Amino acid sequence: MTKIANIKAREVLDSRGNPTVEADVILEDGTLGRACAPSGASTGSREALELRDGDASRYLGKGVRKAVEAINGQIRDALLGKDAADQRSLDQIMIDLDGTENKANLGANAILAVSLAAAKAAAVSLGKPLYEHIADVNGTSGKFSMPVPMMNILNGGEHADNNVDIQEFMVQPVSVNSFGEALRVGAEIFHSLKKVLKAQGLNTAVGDEGGFAPNLPSNEAALAAIKEAVEKAGYELGKDVTLALDCASSEFYKDGQYQLSGEGKSFDSEGFADYLSGLCDRYPIVSIEDGMDESDWDGWKVLTDKLGSKVQLVGDDLFVTNTKILKQGIEKGIGNSILIKFNQIGSLTETLDAIKMAQDAGYTAVISHRSGETEDTTIADLAVATCAGQIKTGSLCRSDRVAKYNQLLRIEEALEGKAPYRGLSEIKGQG
């Protein structure tokens, strides 16, 4: 029933107007599963390879015809007649077919699109919602939770054309009892922030992930604006709402220094750890992502020793959803959380393996979108299915972001109280 009858792929556009891969997996019973691969802007150097054409005459060289051809040719031939419900076997066939450490032959974007489309097709054929099927694949059948959203309401760094160095300033509604209420709180704060910025004569255009992207005198000015917005929305910062940062430090780490060009400051690893610690002293920041460069493991150790007992320290560029790298981090006591991005590793199976490794080691796993997104909502189901407890999927604006939030609303409704929203206790160091 769940045997694969056909696979086909096409070039579609992501939220930045760049091509990405969409794959259809059709089963013998006629069931269709469809999925798109996302794409990042600030990428870790050890991520699986996103295959692009490099043909300057099309899409500025960013076309993905090679990846589409890989799906319509080699991948299709290898998977026809295989069981879409056997996720691990399907993914392993594609990994072996590629034959490289970083999926450089077929492309992580090609393999991932097929991997997710197969999972969707199997779920439909088996008469199950996607989150239920992913939980079955994960060996955690029947266990679900709703994630705390990290809402990126103010953008800087590679996600915006402004002078703010830190890439993401996020709010987390933690005092409510449901995801639906958390979404409402986030939306109210988002609209409040727009009014705060307008009152200061600042630009209210949005960045790649739907957050506002004004020019500000410092990173702390961004935090101050969010604090004012939270309070004007009627909430208490530190009680109802906590803050999270994504520094994306690799983007401003040069010659052994963390260079905050927007502020005209430069720090060594110890100094930057002190800078971040100071922000945490002045604001209720409970999570910091990529607080050090991906290659600065000594700096990561300094940061972990300084803040790791009270702040969630999330490795994104550091770990790139890769179990081999995560294992090293766990052994060395680096960070205490991992950001999970499907396309950093390139298959559903490997993504689930990374989440399990993190959770078994007492690390949290934060499910994440990419800055280049589509209408695909698979990460919403993944967050619920793995009881990850946290999700990053942008601001309360742009359909590519809101699509994931709306899917979570549907899932919460369908589960009728069987997926608790645990709030602050989901965040490492807070529960």
From Swiss-Prot:
Species this chain originates from: Marinobacter nauticus (strain ATCC 700491 / DSM 11845 / VT8)
Pathway per the UniProt entry: Carbohydrate degradation; glycolysis; pyruvate from D-glyceraldehyde 3-phosphate: step 4/5
Swiss-Prot/TrEMBL cofactor(s): Mg(2+)
Binding site for (2R)-2-phosphoglycerate: 167, 341, 370-371, 392
Entry-linked Pfam families: Enolase_C, Enolase_N
Descriptive protein name: Enolase
Signal sequence range: none
Gene symbol of the encoding locus: eno
Co-factor binding details: Binds a second Mg(2+) ion via substrate during catalysis.
